[in-house]
C-alpha cells in the first residue's frame, strides 16, 4: 500500500502536529474526530507514517526500512484495532492485545503506534480496558483514536486524549481537489453542497451507484407526496442500504428545517430538491420535522452500535412517518 498524503485542506493542522512532534511535545494519545468524509483517515495515516519513519522531514521519507514495511502493509510497531469483519463493535479481546503490545519494546527502536477506529465502536468493557494503557502508556507510545461521533465514546476515554476536531471544509479550500476528482466546477460544487462540506464524502456520493440510490430515494418521496403507500415504497428500497437511506433522510430533514425557518433556498444543501421541500414545508410544521429528525438519528445510532433493529421495519416506520407529514 502506498503511504497516504495529507489532504490539502488539512495542511495547517498537519503543520501544527509536526511542530509538536519535532519539539518533543506530542501527547501520548490523540483523538482525531470529524464527520465521515472530512479526511481524518488520511491525516492519521500520514501521522502514523511520519511517527514510524527513521528519517522524517515534513512527511515520512517513504524510503527507509520502516516506511517500506509500512507500505507493504505490515509494521511490527503498529497495531490497528477495529471491529471484526461483519461486526459493529470493538470487543475486549483486541484491547487486551493492545495492553500486551504497549508493554513490549519497539522492534525498530522508535515509537509504538496504536490506532483505534472507529473509537466509538468500543463497547464498555473494551473502553474500560483501554483506560489502563491510556493512563500508563510508557515511553514512545502514540495512541491515535479516530471517531465520527466522539459523543458516543466514554467521557473518561475522551478526557485522556488531546482532541483534534476536523470541521466541514469551505469550498474554496477543497475546490481544486474536487474538480480534479469530479471533472468540473459545477459537479464539484453541487456534490460539495450535498455532502455538507465533506470532500471525500462528496466524491463517494457522486459515484454512479450512489447517484442511483439518491435518485431512487427521491423518487420514493415524490411518490409519497402523490399518495403512494409507505410500506410499498419501503419494499422498493434496498434494506441493505438502510444507513445511507437514513443519512439522506436526515440531510433532507435538516434542509427542510433550514428552509422552514428561513424561507431561503440559499441555505439548502440539496438545492435540486427544493420543489419537494416546498411541498413538505407547506404541509408540515417545523416542530414535526424536528421530531422526525430525532427519530431518524436514533434509528441510525441504534444501527451503528449493533442494536440490530429490523431494517425493513425501520424503513417502513420511517416512511410512514414521512408520509403522515407530507400529507398533513
Predicted features and spans:
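Charged, glycine-rich active-site and insertion segments that engage polyanionic ligands
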Residues: 1-50, 69, 139-142, 148-328
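Conserved catalytic/switch belt of AAA+ P-loop NTPases
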Residues: 103, 128-145
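Clamp-loader machinery-focused feature within the broader ASCE/P-loop NTPase space
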Residues: 2-125
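A short beta-strand motif that forms part of the nucleic acid-binding face
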Residues: 85, 134, 209
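Catalytic acidic motif of RecA-like/P-loop NTPases
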Residues: 117-123, 128-135, 151
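Conserved adenine-binding aromatic site and its adjacent loop/helix in ATP-hydrolyzing domains
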Residues: 100, 132, 155, 159
Amino acid at each position: 500500500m502506498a503511504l497516504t498524503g495529507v489532504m490539502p485542506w488539512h495542511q495547517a493542522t498537519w503543520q501544527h502536529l509536526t511542530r509538536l512532534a519535532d519539539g518533543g511535545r506530542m501527547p501520548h494519545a490523540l483523538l482525531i474526530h470529524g464527520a465521515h468524509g472530512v479526511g481524518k483517515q488520511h491525516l492519521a495515516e500520514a501521522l502514523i507514517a511520519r511517527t514510524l519513519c527513521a528519517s522524517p522531514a515534513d512527511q515520512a521519507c517513504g524510503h527507509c526500512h520502516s516506511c517500506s514495511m509500512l507500505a507493504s502493509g505490515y509494521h511490527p510497531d503498529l497495531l490497528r484495532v477495529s471491529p471484526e469483519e461483519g461486526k459493529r463493535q470493538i470487543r475486549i479481546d483486541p484491547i487486551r492485545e493492545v495492553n500486551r503490545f504497549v508493554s513490549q519494546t519497539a522492534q525498530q527502536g522508535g515509537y509504538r503506534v496504536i490506532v483505534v477506529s472507529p473509537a466509538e465502536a468500543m463497547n464498555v468493557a473494551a473502553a474500560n480496558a483501554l483506560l489502563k494503557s491510556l493512563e500508563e502508556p510508557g515511553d514512545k507510545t502514540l495512541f491515535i483514536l479516530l471517531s465520527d461521533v466522539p459523543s458516543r465514546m466514554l467521557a473518561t476515554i475522551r478526557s485522556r486524549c488531546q482532541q483534534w476536531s476536523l470541521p466541514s471544509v469551505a469550498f474554496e479550500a477543497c475546490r481544486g481537489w474536487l474538480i480534479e476528482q469530479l471533472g468540473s466546477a459545477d459537479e464539484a460544487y453541487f456534490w460539495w453542497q450535498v455532502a455538507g462540506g465533506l470532500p471525500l464524502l462528496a466524491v463517494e456520493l457522486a459515484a454512479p451507484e450512489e447517484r442511483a440510490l439518491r435518485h431512487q430515494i427521491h423518487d420514493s418521496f415524490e411518490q409519497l407526496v402523490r399518495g403512494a403507500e409507505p410500506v410499498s415504497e419501503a419494499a422498493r428500497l434496498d434494506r441493505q442500504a438502510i444507513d445511507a437511506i437514513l443519512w439522506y433522510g436526515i440531510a433532507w430533514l435538516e434542509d427542510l428545517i433550514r428552509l422552514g425557518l428561513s424561507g431561503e433556498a440559499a441555505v439548502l444543501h440539496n438545492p435540486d430538491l427544493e420543489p419537494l421541500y416546498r411541498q413538505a414545508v407547506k404541509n408540515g410544521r417545523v416542530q414535526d420535522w424536528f421530531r422526525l429528525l430525532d427519530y431518524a438519528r436514533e434509528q441510525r445510532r441504534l444501527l451503528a452500535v449493533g442494536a440490530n433493529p429490523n431494517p425493513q421495519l425501520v424503513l417502513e416506520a420511517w416512511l410512514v412517518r414521512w408520509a403522515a407529514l407530507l400529507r398533513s
